[in-house]
């Protein structure tokens, strides 16, 4: 009887482990029948049993190690529950290294969506190991045999995981994470480089502006353009989309009803991939972002000689007499959006550091209400410079863990729903500001999204963006039901702003109605799926296992309440789609050096810490030395001042360097060896001033350039004596005798 009680915690763990799926269905209000639920639940139970056996075998060899493994697997399961709840995707292991995950995990720890469930699952798992160890499940005599049993079970689990479904609705969460990660890391792109000569036409369009009927017949002259980009908002939240497509949603952005009488709506609007920097690049470039998680095209754009860069939307509008400004809530250093937007042609670039006194403290930047209210000053200043003008705004409050107070969140079923409601209120006030402004009658306003944080029961809901245009030029509400994507915005705004634009220009404008469809591609780098459509209502999907499917909407639109899904064996079509993906993903930089930022002046205050750069999302080549070089000048420091330069990446490399009067200018290189291809690599660089100077003089550090360089062999330079692994407590003597300090920090020699 006593031994039977020993298995009770294991039974409870299996129940809680499999109940996570049901919990998500209930909280996300997804209705499924028993037939759709029992098979995935049985998989959860089977994987749960295997996890218990793996931990049991390890406990016989090393009890502490088994608890550590159980902790990792339990937290990984709970992280997937949070990720699915927030973004409708499982965690991809490559994303663990991303800077965004640090904020995601930190936010989750303070705002766990299912605290009781999390505690019960972890407690039952730990108790299972404790009590199962008392049972003679494996009668193995030596530690060696127990380790072999553990290794065999672990390999079996990994094999099952790799072969399982990558969709959380059909497979176990942890297994799906492992499967998707392995699939993305082993994707073979080398065999898909036979590009047809007309590939641009095949992935974009052969249509010309003149092929579409212009829908804004009342539009005259050059008007101001304001583009409001809302973090992660899917098209499912648009009241007009819900009504037109007959797809109800518990979340509705009623503020968009205020523009109903003078609006143009795109119900079939695509965001081409996940991640803000990719969406923003597509909006201002008229180009696809990469369909995978490799180095964003925005960084590759920065590497090009300025005289050879393609002219992007801000520059093209500036050439037509527009004053331009980019205003975002997040700090400009993150993802180097400040550098990219400046290179893109914006005259003025404003980031989160320019916003004060938020209503809700939030790590990513000002909350949406504070952002919209304080942005009015910058828009008024831009308007005062003369017309016409173009401004792009980017919110951040609907990014996980969401900029709302706990009391506000309690009024809604989830923090995400609360954050969208808060954005809705803030946007309503901002629309009122526009309506009462002096520029209201002369301005086109676009409400769009940078990406989509997912929609329940939508096979590509992570690519359903919102688009609503608002202008006195628009009489009533126009529904343009064609399929458009972020890449179409550039030409659309030129079509709007420039009446002399050549009608024979190749491309599509959202302000025109076309009788024929055009090709479009989109993807989710969370799970590696790629989608391709040439006809509205039919989408081809290649999942990360290489299986080809046809998705057919019931209503004939791109988005529907029901879809038919058919497995196809058309190898020619599959190869064509993957070839398109590879063509879009190929690097345009060509060299082995990436410039992260340059010519940046960072003001310093005593005791204050400033972010120099963060969130780069770079692809690291295999078997290469990685050199991250910081070229700096801190000559404005007083003799008694010293600086701390803190380097940390999400692979565990850390270093703290001291800068004082002896090494106030120079180059510090952080070097490490990278064994395997790494996607989404990011590092954080901060600086802090320690001053004994009370003169009140302004002080700053100038970052001449930060570069990331790859090489197969280590350069001739070797780590300086000052680049030891130990962390210094204060200023250290310079490692070079000349006026410019040169230091190479070997990150593989130690973490500090």
Predicted features, each with a name:
Residues 670-702, 706:
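Extracellular beta-strand ligand-recognition surfaces/modules
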Residues 175-505, 512-525:
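Soluble catalytic regions of membrane-associated enzymes that act on cell-envelope
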Residues 624-626, 638-643, 681, 699, ...:
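Short beta-strand/loop motifs in extracellular/secreted proteins, especially
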Residues 597-599, 605-608, 623-625, 661-667:
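Solvent-exposed, conformationally flexible loop/turn segments
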Residues 317, 614-637, 666-674, 706-708:
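Extra-cytoplasmic beta-strand recognition segments
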Residues 332-335, 475-606, 704, 709-721, ...:
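Membrane-interface soluble catalytic domains
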Residues 608, 631-668, 674:
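Extracellular ligand-binding interfaces
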Residues 1-181:
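Transmembrane and membrane-interface helices of multi-pass
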């Amino acid at each position: 009887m006593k031994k039977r009680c020993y298995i009770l915690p294991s039974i409870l763990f299996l129940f809680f482990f499999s109940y996570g799926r049901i919990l998500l269905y209930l909280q996300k209000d997804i209705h499924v029948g028993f037939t759709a639920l029992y098979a995935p639940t049985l998989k959860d139970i089977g994987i749960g049993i295997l996890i218990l056996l793996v931990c049991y075998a390890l406990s016989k060899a090393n009890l502490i190690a088994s608890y550590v493994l159980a902790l990792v697997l339990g937290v990984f399961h709970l992280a997937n529950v949070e990720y699915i709840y927030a973004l409708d995707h499982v965690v991809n292991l490559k994303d663990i290294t991303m800077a965004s995950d640090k904020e995601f995990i930190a936010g989750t720890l303070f705002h766990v969506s299912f605290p009781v469930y999390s505690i019960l699952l972890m407690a039952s798992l730990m108790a299972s190991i404790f009590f199962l160890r008392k049972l003679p499940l494996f009668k193995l005599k030596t530690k060696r045999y127990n380790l072999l049993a553990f290794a065999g079970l672990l390999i079996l689990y990994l094999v099952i995981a790799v072969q399982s479904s990558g969709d959380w609705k059909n497979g176990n969460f942890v297994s799906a994470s492992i499967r998707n990660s392995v699939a993305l890391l082993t994707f073979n792109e080398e065999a898909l480089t036979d590009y047809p000569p007309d590939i641009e036409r095949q992935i974009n369009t052969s249509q010309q502006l003149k092929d579409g009927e212009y829908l804004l017949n009342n539009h005259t002259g050059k008007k101001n353009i304001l583009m409001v980009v809302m973090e992660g908002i899917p098209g499912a939240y648009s009241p007009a989309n819900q009504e037109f497509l007959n797809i109800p949603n518990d979340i509705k952005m009623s503020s968009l009803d205020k523009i109903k009488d003078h609006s143009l709506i795109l119900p079939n609007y695509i965001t081409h991939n996940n991640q803000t920097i990719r969406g923003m690049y597509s909006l201002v470039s008229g180009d696809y972002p990469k369909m995978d998680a490799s180095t964003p095209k925005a960084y590759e754009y920065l590497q090009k000689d300025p005289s050879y860069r393609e002219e992007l939307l801000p520059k093209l509008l500036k050439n037509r007499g527009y004053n331009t400004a980019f205003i975002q809530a997040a700090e400009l250093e993150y993802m180097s959006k400040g550098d990219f937007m400046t290179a893109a042609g914006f005259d003025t670039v404003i980031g989160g550091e320019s916003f004060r006194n938020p209503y809700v403290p939030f790590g990513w930047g000002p909350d949406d209400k504070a952002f919209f209210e304080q942005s009015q000053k910058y828009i008024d200043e831009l308007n005062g410079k003369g017309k016409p003008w173009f401004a792009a705004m980017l919110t951040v409050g609907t990014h996980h863990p969401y900029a709302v107070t706990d009391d506000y969140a309690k009024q809604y079923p989830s923090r995400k729903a609360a954050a969208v409601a808060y954005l809705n209120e803030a946007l309503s006030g901002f629309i009122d500001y526009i309506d009462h402004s002096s520029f209201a009658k002369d301005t086109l306003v676009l409400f769009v999204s940078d990406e989509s944080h997912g929609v329940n029961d939508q096979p590509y809901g992570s690519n359903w963006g919102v688009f609503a245009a608002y202008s006195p030029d628009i009489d009533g509400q126009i529904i343009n039901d064609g399929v458009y994507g972020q890449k179409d915005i550039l030409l659309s705004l030129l079509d709007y702003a420039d009446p002399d634009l050549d009608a024979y220009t190749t491309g599509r404008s959202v302000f025109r109605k076309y009788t024929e469809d055009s090709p479009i591609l989109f993807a989710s780098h969370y799970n590696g799926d790629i989608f391709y459509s040439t006809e509205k209502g039919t989408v081809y999907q290649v999942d990360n296992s290489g299986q080809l499917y046809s998705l057919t909407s019931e209503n004939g639109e791109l988005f529907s309440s029901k879809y038919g899904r058919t497995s196809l064996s058309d190898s020619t079509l599959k190869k064509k789609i993957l070839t398109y993906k590879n063509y879009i993903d190929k690097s345009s930089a060509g060299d082995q050096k990436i410039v992260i930022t340059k010519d940046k002046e960072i003001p310093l205050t005593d005791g204050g810490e400033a972010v120099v750069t963060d969130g780069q999302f770079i692809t690291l080549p295999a078997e290469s030395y990685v050199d991250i070089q910081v070229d700096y000048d801190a000559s404005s420091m007083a003799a008694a001042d010293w600086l701390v330069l803190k380097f940390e990446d999400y692979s565990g490399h850390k270093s703290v360097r001291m800068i004082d009067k002896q090494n106030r200018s120079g180059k510090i290189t952080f070097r490490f060896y990278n064994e395997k291809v790494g996607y989404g690599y990011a590092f954080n660089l901060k600086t802090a001033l320690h001053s004994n100077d009370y003169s009140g003089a302004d002080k700053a550090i100038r970052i001449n350039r930060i570069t990331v360089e790859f090489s197969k062999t280590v350069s001739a330079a070797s780590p300086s004596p000052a680049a030891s692994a130990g962390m210094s407590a204060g200023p250290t003597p310079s490692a070079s005798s000349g006026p410019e300090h040169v230091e190479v920090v070997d990150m593989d020699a130690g973490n500090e």
